[in-house]
């Protein structure tokens, strides 16, 4: 018979039946986000999901992780494009205008995010018919 410390027979330390060696301090708590390798708060998203769904509907743990991962990816994508827009305009701070330029400049994000961005301005656009008239005047 083993040492009598549960199914694994090894107690709390070392490599138990789970297959992972305990490298961290014993009993150290790890957040859902750090376990999933995310920055967005998985626990908070799960709490919001549980609060907003109908009664007697269960929310799986992986659902909150998936939503957090999608939100983190979309946020990183928008911030990267907005940072590029800010850098093109030679400024160091991302403003709502840069967010507007980034979202409306990307076709997929434009269809996904159809909200009006406050202080975002409008997209620069000149009709091609007007451009042709200007070019014809220059040729004369």
Curated annotation (Swiss-Prot):
CDD domains: HFD_H2A. GO terms for molecular function: DNA binding; protein heterodimerization activity; structural constituent of chromatin. Residues 7-18 have a biased composition (Basic residues). One of its GO terms (cellular component) is nucleosome. Residues 1-38 are annotated as: Disordered. Belongs to the histone H2A family. Variant histone H2A which can replace H2A in some nucleosomes. Nucleosomes wrap and compact DNA into chromatin, limiting DNA accessibility to the cellular machineries which require DNA as a template. Histones thereby play a central role in transcription regulation, DNA repair, DNA replication and chromosomal stability. DNA accessibility is regulated via a complex set of post-translational modifications of histones, also called histone code, and nucleosome remodeling. This is Histone H2A.Z. It comes from Yarrowia lipolytica (strain CLIB 122 / E 150) (Yeast).
């Amino acid at each position: 018979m083993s040492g009598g410390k549960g199914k694994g027979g090894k107690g709390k330390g070392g490599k138990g039946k789970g297959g992972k060696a305990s490298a961290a301090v014993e009993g150290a708590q790890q957040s859902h986000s750090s376990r999933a390798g995310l920055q967005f708060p998985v626990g908070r998203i799960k709490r919001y999901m549980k609060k907003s769904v109908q009664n007697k509907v269960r929310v799986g743990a992986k659902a909150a992780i998936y939503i957090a991962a999608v939100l983190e990816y979309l946020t990183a994508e928008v911030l990267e494009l907005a940072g590029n827009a800010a850098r093109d305009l030679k400024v160091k701070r991302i403003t709502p205008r840069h967010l507007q330029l980034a979202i409306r400049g990307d076709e997929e994000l434009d269809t996904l995010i159809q909200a009006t961005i406050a202080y975002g301005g409008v997209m620069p656009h000149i009709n091609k018919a007007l451009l042709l008239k200007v070019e014809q005047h220059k040729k004369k």
